[in-house]
Amino acid sequence: MIYNIVIYFVLCGIAIASLFSKKVRKMWKGEREAFKLLKQKVDPDAKYIWFHAASLGEFEQGRPLMERIRKEHPQYKILLTFFSPSGYEVRKNYEGADIICYMPIDTRLNAIRFLCLVRPVMAFFIKYEFWSNFLHILKYRNIPTYSVSSIFREDQVFFKWYGKSYAGVLRCFTRFFVQNEESKRLLEGIGITDVDVVGDTRFDRVLQIKEAAKYLPICEAFRKGCVPAEDKASDASAEGKASEKDYKVFVAGSSWPPDEDIFIRFFNAHKDWRVIIAPHVIGEDHLKQILSKIQGRKVVRYTQATPEEAAKADVLIIDCFGLLSSMYGYGDVAYVGGGFGVGIHNTLEAAVWNMPVIFGPNNKKFQEAQGLLKSGGGFEINGYEDFEVLMLRFAVSRSENESAGSDSVSFLKSSGEKAGAFVASLSGATDKVMAKVNF
C-alpha cells in the first residue's frame, strides 16, 4: 500500500519534471508509448525472455548473458527494457534484442498489461532492480525470474527492522545470482536460500570489449608521436595492447572537474607525459573549462584532429562518446573519475588492459574497486599530493625498467599486470548463470 502511494507520487513528479527536463521528457514519453510499441512488435506465437536493465551500465552487465542465450537458444526472442534514457537512447538499436523499449512505471495495472502483452517465459533483472508490482505479478504467474549480478549491503532497507515488508519483494525471485558471499549471507539471514555466488558478469563483458577493441589511428599517432603506416594498423587488442609506445601516456576516463584539477596540475608541470582526457560530460562549457586549466601544452580535440596533428600534440581531449573502452589500450596509466563526487565510474574497462588504475576516495561501495586495491592493481588518492607521489613513482619505475632491460619488472608494469590478472581471475559468471537456468 505504502509502496503504491510512493509510486503515485513518483509518477506525478516525473510528469512535472518532464515539463522542464529534456531527459525526463524522453523517459516520460517512452514509458507512455511502451504499450503501443509492444502491441505493434510482439509476436503472439513467440516465446520471449525479458531482460530489464536500469541504464547503460546494467545493460553492459546483462549483455554477455543475453548474447549467450541468443546464440545457444535461438528458439527464444529477447525483450530488453530500460528505465533510464541514458540506457535506452544509446542502445535502442541494439541488434542483440528483438524488442527494445522503456519499462512502464511500476503500477499494478501497468505490470498486468505488460505481462499480458509479452507473456515472457522467464525474466532477468540486472543488479539493483526490485520493482514490487512487476515482481509480484511475475511470481503470481509462475514465471521464473532471476536477479543477476546483484549485490547487497547490510545498510540496505531489506535488512533493517523497518524494511521487513519491502523485503517481501525479494521473495518473488526464483533465484539470485549474486556477486559475493556477503550478499548470500545477508539474503540467507532473511530466509532467502535460492542464492548462488557467481561473481559479476561485467568481468566477462570487459574481456569481450577488449577482444573487439577498435583501432584508433588518431590515438595511435598520439601515442607514437608519428603517423602509423597503414600496413601496420591493427586492432588495439592485439596481444593486450597496441604496439610498443614511444611516449608515456596517461588516460583519464569519465573525469569530472575535481579530478581534472588534480591531474591537469600535475601534467602542466611534468611535460614528459602525454595525456588523453575523456570527460564524463562533453558539453562545450566543460570542454572550455578543461582547456582553460591546461598550460604550456599543445592540445587537440579528437573530433577536430588529424593523425598528423595528434602526433604533435601533448594532450588529446575526447569530445565524443563510444571510444573510451578502446582508448584505454593506448595508455600506460589510467585514472577513472567520479571518486571525488557521487562515486567512481567503470574501473574494469581500464584494468582489463593490464594497466594500473587510479581513482578518488568515494569507492567503498564498488566491489571491483576494492578488489583492485587489494590486488595491487588499483590506487586510491585523496588529493594532489597522493597523485603526485604515485605518478612520480610510476615515471621513475618506467625509466628504470627501460634502462635495466626487458628482464626488469617495474612497479608500473607489475601494477598493471596485477590489475589485468584481477579481471581475468573473476571472469566466468555468465557460464555459471547459464549452467543454473533451465531453458
Language-model features, listed with the residues they occupy:
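Nucleotide-activated sugar donor-binding and catalytic core shared by glycosyltransferases
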Residues: M1-F439
